[in-house]
Amino acid sequence: EASLGVTLFERSAKGMFPTPDGEVFVRYAKTVLKQVDAIENMFSGDHAAKTQFSISVPRASYIADAFAKFSKLIEKGTDAELFYKETNALRAIKNLLNDEFKLGIVRYAESFDKYYKNMMDEKGLEYELIAEFRYKLLFHKDSPLAQMDEVTYDDLRDLVMIAHADPYVPSLPFSEVKKEELPDNSDRKILVFERASQFELLAENHETFMWSSPIPRPLLERYGLAQRYCRDNKRVYKDVLIHRKDYTLSEIDNMFIEELVKAKRETFGEEM
């Protein structure tokens, strides 16, 4: 700190925390250390370059579909590691800042656009809109909702809502985030962290439903599910691709992004 002439850490009885300058310093220090490791590996006799891909994403089926198709593009004999983590928006951003993942996709309600863009600008992140959409109701084809010509919030009151348990928006109370992210019109709720479990629940318990971005048709057919808009829910959501400004997209990154755009077009169709 003395040689740099800046304060990198704030010290108190509760511990030591990085200042904004400290966060930048730590981020670049990690990058330098990784580059040193890469140079050491280059001249240690292990010359085979390993292909790596890493991304943090929301629990979205069209994104998972894109990743599955992307994985088939990795040629046999390639030394490759692919990391795919489903998590909330804040953790996706932290994974980039900590240099644990190279890419991220964050999902948030349009009303929080300013909060996220301000934070990403402050943290030195590039961002690009992938999709803009309204949530649909997702339910089994034998659900009471399937028989209705039009669905309202009141129709959901006696059903069981499945929701992801960890929405998060910086600088806002959690109660406000839940109110905006999760329309709360059901007395019974099941909170899940794993996307796979939601499909098992929807297929087995026909009184369940959840709010979801558009789902690929093959997945709907596999679990006997259907989707429909709710007349009362007009909220718009965004999926945004992010990466650090000091990171250059690799060939494998662009391969995934190409599959992501294809999956979005196939799944969203005329809703785009």
Language-model regions, residue ranges each:
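A short LG(V/I)-centered, amphipathic sequence patch enriched
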Residues: 1-18
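Short amphipathic alpha-helical coupling segments at ligand-binding clamshell hinges
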Residues: 21, 25-28, 65-69, 248-260
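Central regulatory/effector-binding core of bacterial HTH transcription factors
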Residues: 50-116
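Secondary-structure junction motif
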Residues: 63-69, 113, 145, 149, ...
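Beta->alpha turn/N-cap motifs
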Residues: 88-89, 105-112, 140-141, 204-207, ...
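Hydrophobic hinge/microswitch elements
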Residues: 97-102, 166-226
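Flexible hinge/capping segments at coil-to-helix
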Residues: 119-135, 139-161
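A late-sequence structural motif
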Residues: 214-217, 226-272
